[in-house]
Amino acid sequence: MDTRLSGYTILIVDDDPDILESMELAMRAEGATTAVAEDGTEAVQESERVNPDAVILDMMLPKRSGFLVLEELTKTDSPPVVIMVTANEGKRHMAYAQSLGVSEYLYKPVSLDRLINRVSTLLEERANQTHE
């Protein structure tokens, strides 16, 4: 069985329970350990608790926006790979996310296969950089 994400912990943050569940099932099917959060405040708390390798982050969240969460995540000593997923196609939002250090910016709806491929590729690239 193809388990490209074995050994990795992935935090999935989205306020839509259906999206959250489908992303979590897809990541687990690839061997990842997962944690979930439904709002920005919970996302920061979960990130501190599980120290994820990657975070899949919705931009529009209750309590604390995805941008504020991204800012917190990139301040850590070993920041995770962060993939922001959003239905908002504004170029300013993408530019702002990039200025904060987002690893990838994807528009909803995003296929689970594409999401898994991007997470896997970004984690592999990071692993290769640390071993050089």
How would you name each of these model-derived features?
Residues K108:
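A Lys-centered signature of the CheY-like receiver
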Residues L68, E89-E104, N117:
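Alpha4 helix (beta4-alpha4-beta5 surface) of REC/receiver domains from two-component response regulators
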Residues D16, M59-M60:
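The short loop immediately C-terminal to the conserved phospho-acceptor aspartate in CheY-like receiver
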Residues D39-E42, S65-L68:
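Acidic catalytic/metal-coordinating carboxylates
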Residues M1-T9, D113-E132:
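Non-catalytic signal-transmission and effector/linker regions of two-component phosphorelay proteins
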Residues L20, P62, G90:
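The feature encodes the CheY-like receiver
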Residues P17-A35:
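Two-component/phosphorelay signaling modules centered on CheY-like receiver
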